[in-house]
Amino acid sequence: YGPWINENSLWANLNHPVVRDYFDTYFREAIFALKDHPAVYGWDVFNESHHRTDDEWTTRKYQEWLREKYGTIEKLNKEWYRRYESFAQVRPEKRRASYSIWSSLLPAVEYEKFRAESLTEICRFLYNTAKKYDYIHPIMIDGTSAMILVDDLTLRNCDEFETAYVPDIYGATFYPKSWGKNFKDTPWTLSMYFSIPAG
């Protein structure tokens, strides 16, 4: 926790169009250089997929998401108990301010829903970009196991049920000796988690 909690959680902002151009170039060069090597089974395009940031690119994406969901700022104001004049005034970094959550939890809830959908879209972009250069090898994405490992889902928010439909292989991240959670008394927890890709 701390003042950095909503800063970009990765080394590059996956919502920035220039970064996406770089990903396209990188995938093209790496895949063309390696795809015929016999040791290549497939491509893991996003390990421990998560994305947490309140930067301007993501904020604009969020404002557009709200516009598509609510249609008018008047409808959003009615649902959220707010008085915005335009979607451009909605700032996600204010969503958990005390005045905000006392009047309505929707700003915080909606932003987490947006973040989950945005991450799935990012994963779809990475999958499609890699598949464009290699349609033979399987493409893998894996989640963070956040829903069974952390108490605050906002740290690594994702919708693994939806994201699991994107790649050819959906994997999981779990370190049994980490975080003091080995689930020896509740083995069904991991069973449920690993059944996510099956739907």
Where is each model-derived feature located?
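Ligand-binding pocket scaffold of soluble enzyme catalytic domains
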Residues: 189-192
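Polysaccharide-binding and catalytic clefts of secreted carbohydrate-active enzymes
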Residues: 2-161, 165-169, 173-183, 187
